[in-house]
Amino acid sequence: MSGRVLLGGRDSVPLRGTWAVLHRVTRQSAGPIDSVRTDTAGRYRMQLQRPRAAADSGAVYVVSTWHDSLAYFSLPLNVQGRTAVRVEDLVVYRTTKGTPPIELARRLVTLGLPGADGTREVLEILELQNTGLSTRITDDTLVPTWSGAIPPSAIQFQAGQGDISGEAIKRVGDRVFVLGAIPPGQPKQLTYGYTLPAGGGRFAIPIDQATRDLNLLVEDTVAAVEAPGVESLGVQPVEDRRFAAYRAGPLAPGDRVTIGLPRGPFRPQMLVPYVVGLLGAGMLGALVWALRRKPLASGPATP
């Protein structure tokens, strides 16, 4: 298999002399199996041995490289039945702290009907865009690479999995902190959920930063949604339920977005058929994963 390692910037250039490492991942084990340094053109070539056992035939292979304190990985490689495998270019970046700015490109908020105890589950999926030419990092848990506001009344916060690992997401007061690296390129998704206590009459979504697009999925089709330039996308029947979809944006810090809180049970899995058309494949994978997560355990509220 062969590929290139490039140093990203205004013009990507070959990265000479860096290690390209081939990894094999099976159900039983995972680890590097070969490595080579790139040449003057940033190219590398490695020989992949044919599987020695039936268990190895289901192995997944990836190529990684390391630059400026960060590891970069290729997508999983399809090697079955192929004599040559071309790996996508691995583009690495220098790292910086505090810059470049991270934009909130898209925010999806899903609000369900109250459960038997009156609480309501909220799921959010966000897309963050690094607008610069370097990967933003942090080494201080009090200085996140990005942060955003959530309702002060939210309890039982739980980070999900996306492009940004749930382990790199935490709640600090009324904010969500991202501590993971955010490289340039395609927007990176993060997912989290929380519970709204019973008794609230309206759900206010805090807008603390510029947001290009805001999508809302509300299970109550007659809920009063208020937002600057809000657009109704209609009501979609899904089995025995109906969901109202809305779009707003671009939004400025301080813009007011509120939703009247309905009543009734919420089965989030029913959202999936509609979301296919509304969001497309990009956000759908994250939404499906998040909605299939185990329900939040009942217990004391977390700050």
Placement of each model-derived feature along the sequence:
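Lumenal/extracellular ectodomains and adaptor appendage modules
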Residues: 1-303
